[in-house]
């Protein structure tokens, strides 16, 4: 995270909600980009999750906000993973959705939202993400996903993009498609 340098820097957000918890006092960010990768529906072969993990490591992100798991995750459908070693329960890992902050090698502040796609309260979750993004001064949001596509492994994978903005699409050279599919959270 960067030191404050101008009018677009954002200090400690004051938004509070019982659906999330701030893990830091003052995340100082300058016009960050928000990258969203929620595992679940749209992540063929775990490609998008691997991309988000790589980005998080390269930008040396650390958690700044954690969502309340009981509010958004159905643990009957997404059970915690119990680690057993020689019959001893050594750990219990719960799914969690968190927002991490870091900086790219070019000095750009990056926010990475990771975890499982919410099982419930999608409208509330979307509003919270939108409000938090505004509070933190986010200038752009990018969602990672990977659709399954029948293509030989000998071919270069195709990248595609979608956006609610025709202005954004005018500035990218990725393939565009027309299709009706079940939507993911991101």
Predicted regions located by residue number:
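N-terminal short beta-loop-beta anion/metal-coordinating cradle
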Residues: 2-115
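Short, well-ordered, mixed-charge alpha-helical segments that flank or form enzyme active sites
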Residues: 44, 119-123, 148-154
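Flexible, glycine/proline-enriched loop segments at strand-loop-helix junctions
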Residues: 38-42, 112-122, 172-182
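Non-transmembrane, aqueous-exposed alpha-helical and coiled segments at domain scale
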Residues: 17, 107-108, 123, 127, ...
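Short acidic/polar active-site loop segments enriched in Thr and Asp
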Residues: 139
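Catalytic cores of processing enzymes, dominated by hydrolases/peptidases
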Residues: 150-186
């Amino acid at each position: 995270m960067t030191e404050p340098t101008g009018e677009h820097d954002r200090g400690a957000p004051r938004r509070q909600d019982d659906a999330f918890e701030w893990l830091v006092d003052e995340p100082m960010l300058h016009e960050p980009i928000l990258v969203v990768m929620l595992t679940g529906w749209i992540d063929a072969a775990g490609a998008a999750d691997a991309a988000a993990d790589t980005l998080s490591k390269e930008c040396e992100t650390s958690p700044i906000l954690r969502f309340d798991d009981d509010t958004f995750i159905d643990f009957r459908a997404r059970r915690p993973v119990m680690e057993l070693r020689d019959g001893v329960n050594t750990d219990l890992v719960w799914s969690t959705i968190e927002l991490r902050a870091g900086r790219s090698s070019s000095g750009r502040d990056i926010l990475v939202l990771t975890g499982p796609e919410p099982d419930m309260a999608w409208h509330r979750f979307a509003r919270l993400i939108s409000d938090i993004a505004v509070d933190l001064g986010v200038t752009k949001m990018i969602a990672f996903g990977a659709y399954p596509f029948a293509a030989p492994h000998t071919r270069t994978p195709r990248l595609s993009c979608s956006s609610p903005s025709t202005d954004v699409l005018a500035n990218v050279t990725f393939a565009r498609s027309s299709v009706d599919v079940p939507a993911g959270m991101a």
